[in-house]
């Protein structure tokens, strides 16, 4: 009897943990519509399919291959070359010029205009990679 109750509680706890993992993460919107999600484990989903992953060491994987890297100082690399930077104030630079910004409230600005939004934003650099650096077709 006690074993059965324990197993039921363990299964309920496992189910709750699974639901929480799937709920957490950055929901990405463009033009008001949900277009993707960065899950808490780093998986990148576009239109429901996993298309890549942000590794904890900064590597950016697209379709299983390492395509780039997010450096600790904010530099964004693609195939080894620096292609841009996420500044500490959340400005986005490409080729040295400021082209956009990730606002603290999650709004994504490109040349001053809001082009999207990241809800429950957990990592500004990952969000910037999704909208500005072309690793994923967002």
What are these regions (language model features)?
Residues 2-45, 49-51, 56-57, 65-67, ...:
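Long terminal segments
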């Amino acid at each position: 009897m006690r074993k059965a109750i324990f197993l039921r509680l363990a299964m309920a706890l496992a189910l709750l943990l699974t639901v929480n993992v799937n709920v957490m993460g950055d929901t990405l919107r463009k033009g008001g519509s949900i277009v993707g999600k960065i899950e808490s484990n780093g998986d990148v989903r576009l239109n429901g399919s996993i298309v890549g992953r942000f590794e904890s060491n900064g590597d950016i994987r697209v379709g299983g291959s390492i395509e780039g890297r997010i450096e600790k100082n904010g530099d964004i690399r693609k195939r080894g070359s620096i292609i841009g930077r996420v500044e500490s104030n959340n400005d986005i630079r490409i080729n040295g010029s400021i082209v956009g910004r990730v606002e603290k409230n999650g709004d994504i600005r490109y040349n001053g205009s809001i082009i999207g939004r990241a809800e429950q934003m957990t990592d500004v650099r990952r969000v910037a990679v999704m909208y500005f650096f072309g690793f994923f077709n967002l």
